[in-house]
């Protein structure tokens, strides 16, 4: 998304507005010392931007804006940057409904219609200054209910002047005429609102069950105009059908909301701005808890997950869900704003496999710079532009950096208890890790072989980008162990060996939770093991822990195979006979390529040698082979070692159980 689409949200606390740090980094160098604030009625204000305590703050000129639009504590403002130091501003009251903009008038300026008031005594006549009133309903628990002298179910709002009265800046219009075209939040509105259906807006903050409820004030104004199914549209143009039901006199989003929430990864504290544009259609903007507009993901169609990937990092899982960036998103958003004056392009790395020895430059950018760059170019990373994870969020504790989310990669069928999850959170809070904690569990293979798999995304990003030795130590202990990390595997994880002595010294067994803290220094990479008070991880036959969140569990299959297949533990880890393997197979871990006779089918599987038993096992990738070829109990596989091949290759001849005599 280009800078033209950047937005942030601000809740009025105090008498100034501080621009969120993340947003300030996005627009650094793009705005002047004075910015223009534009409200929906078209009026603009010049406001000075000052830098104070490493923050951008709106100062000179802000007071006039705040007075004209009667800003109060806890009012919510949405700032959308439209380029050229210009922001479009929408104002919401604390109950989440968009405020009726005050009628801003010029000092002593005569109105332009016969019968109107000859002069305005004040440059601003707010609704509260009028002498006649009518009632409107308020949502429950509204801050206005605490005001003395105000009825708990109504608020005094000005009655409009006579229809023949209007001023140069704006005029009131007939409420009956407004009822259909504008659907304004309050019963009456200004004339310009009749032609702006998006003015009918409300804001929701996601807090447990409240995120689905449409504000009562808004619901009352659109009652009878919304069908049983609403259409939610996000800025990237995608729409979602969500069922609306009436429960306890409230309108609630039901069926379809979960799909929307998952697609855009809604989390606790996110803020959503809903704009009603008629015909049961809402336009939705999404802001994160730091008040910056979220980068909207787009749905990736026909993208399958590798069947033998039972361990995924949060980033890998997010990529394999319908909620990641795709080439359509790049085409539709990143390239649209480019022209001959622009000198930049974006590349999105979808996975580790995208990191190759070459990088294709987009055709449009290549056309822009054709004939202007030499055959060899220099790549520089700007030191003053931090990554998204390095940017510090403003916090009440003085701007301390938020602790990074841990990486949960648990084997199939292993779940963490709530007590263990709480212990992880307490540990994060205590040690404030610079690199996310890596959390996994001991499974049968790890205990037997003395090996442990690491999510390759995590290993590449935080540990190593090549094969090397890592120092392993226990928190508070002096003893260290050397482990080897194999980054040459073709799967989504990296195999580490040399753990057997560590497992024995720490009395680790199957099902125990392991929490590792990674750190880097000039001497290399180190992993610190943090023991748990209650480390055993319960095993479930029905659920596995989602790698995205420590508290969310999703149903998952026990093994990647067809419904008719029921493999034993031995078959899940294909083992070759010791006699055959010692004579014909290599004696170090490597990948094996599996082929079928007279077909082009190929599959890679990890060959692991258990040095204690000399067993040769096919591990990661074998499950995919079983699933691809629909192997069942009593099927026979004949493995033929292919000679004169640079890489270890075996042809597998499959004899189905019905074919055996």
UniProtKB/Swiss-Prot annotation:
Pfam families recorded: B3
Compartments in which it is found: Nucleus
Keyword field contains Transport: no
An MF annotation (GO) of this entry: DNA binding
Main location: nucleus
DNA-binding region: 2-95, 197-290, 437-535, 562-658
InterPro entries (alphabetical): B3_DNA-bd, DNA-bd_pseudobarrel_sf, REM16-like
Cytoplasm listed as a keyword: no
Top-rank taxon, per record: Eukaryota
Keywords recorded for this protein, A-Z: DNA-binding, Nucleus, Repeat, Transcription, Transcription regulation
A GO cellular-component term linked to this record: nucleus
Full protein name: B3 domain-containing protein Os12g0591400
């Amino acid at each position: 998304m280009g800078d033209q689409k950047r937005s942030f949200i601000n809740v009025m606390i105090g008498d100034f507005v501080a621009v969120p740090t993340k947003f300030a980094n996005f627009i650094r160098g793009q705005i002047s010392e004075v910015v223009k604030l534009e409200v929906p009625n078209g009026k603009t204000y010049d406001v000075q931007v000052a830098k104070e305590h490493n923050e951008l703050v709106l100062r000179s000129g802000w007071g006039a804006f705040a007075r004209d639009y009667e800003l109060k504590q806890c009012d919510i403002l949405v700032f959308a940057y439209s380029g050229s130091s210009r922001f479009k501003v929408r104002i919401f009251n604390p109950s989440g409904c968009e405020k009726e903009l005050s009628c801003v008038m010029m000092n002593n300026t005569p109105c332009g219609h016969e019968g109107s008031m000859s002069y305005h005594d004040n440059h601003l006549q707010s609704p509260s200054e009028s002498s006649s009133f009518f009632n409107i309903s308020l949502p429950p628990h509204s801050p206005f209910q605490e005001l003395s002298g105000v009825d708990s179910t109504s608020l005094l709002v000005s009655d409009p002047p006579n229809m023949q009265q209007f001023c140069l800046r704006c005029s009131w219009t007939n409420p009956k005429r407004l009822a259909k075209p504008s659907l304004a939040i309050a019963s009456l509105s200004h004339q310009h609102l009749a032609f702006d259906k998006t003015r009918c807006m409300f804001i929701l903050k996601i807090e447990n069950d409240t995120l689905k409820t449409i504000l009562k004030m808004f619901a009352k104004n659109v009652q009878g105009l919304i069908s049983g199914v609403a259409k939610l549209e996000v800025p990237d143009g995608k729409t979602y059908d969500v069922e609306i039901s009436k429960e306890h006199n409230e309108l609630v989003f039901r069926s379809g909301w979960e799909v929307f929430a998952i697609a855009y990864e809604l989390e606790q504290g996110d803020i959503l701005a809903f704009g009603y544009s008629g015909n049961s259609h809402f336009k939705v903007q999404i802001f994160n808890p730091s008040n910056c507009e979220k980068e909207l993901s787009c749905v990736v169609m026909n993208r399958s997950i590798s069947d033998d990937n039972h361990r995924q990092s949060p980033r890998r899982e997010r990529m394999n869900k319908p909620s990641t960036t795709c080439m359509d998103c790049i085409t539709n958003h990143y390239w649209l704003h480019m022209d001959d004056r622009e000198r930049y392009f974006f590349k999105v790395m979808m996975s580790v496999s995208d990191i190759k020895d070459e990088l294709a430059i987009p055709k449009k950018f290549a056309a822009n710079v054709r004939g202007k760059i030499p055959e060899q170019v220099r790549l520089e990373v700007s030191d003053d532009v931090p990554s998204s994870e390095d940017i510090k969020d403003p916090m009440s504790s003085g701007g301390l950096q938020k602790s990074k989310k841990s990486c949960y990669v648990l084997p199939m069928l292993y779940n963490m208890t709530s007590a263990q999850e709480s212990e992880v959170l307490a540990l994060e809070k205590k040690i404030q890790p610079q690199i996310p904690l890596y959390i996994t569990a001991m499974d049968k293979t790890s205990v037997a072989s003395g090996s442990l798999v690491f999510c390759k995304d995590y290993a590449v990003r935080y540990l190593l980008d090549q094969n090397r030795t890592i120092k392993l130590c226990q928190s508070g202990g002096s003893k260290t162990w050397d482990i080897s990390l194999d980054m040459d595997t073709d799967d989504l994880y990296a195999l580490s060996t040399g753990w057997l002595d560590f497992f024995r010294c720490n009395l680790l067994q199957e099902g125990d939770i392991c929490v590792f803290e990674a750190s880097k220094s000039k001497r290399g990479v180190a992993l610190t093991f943090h023991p748990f008070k209650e480390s055993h991880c319960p095993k479930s036959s029905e659920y596995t822990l989602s790698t995205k969140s420590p508290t969310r569990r999703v149903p998952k299959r026990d093994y990647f195979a067809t419904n008719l297949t029921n493999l034993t533990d031995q078959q899940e880890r294909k083992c070759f006979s010791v006699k055959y393997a010692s004579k014909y197979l290599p004696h170090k871990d490597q990948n094996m390529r599996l082929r079928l006779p007279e077909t082009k089918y190929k599959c890679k599987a990890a060959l692991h040698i258990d040095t204690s038993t000399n067993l040769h096992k096919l591990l990661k990738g074998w499950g995919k082979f079983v699933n691809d070829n629909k192997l069942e109990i009593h099927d026979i596989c004949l493995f033929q070692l292919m000679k004169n091949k640079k890489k270890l290759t075996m042809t597998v001849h499959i004899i189905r159980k019905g074919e055996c005599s």
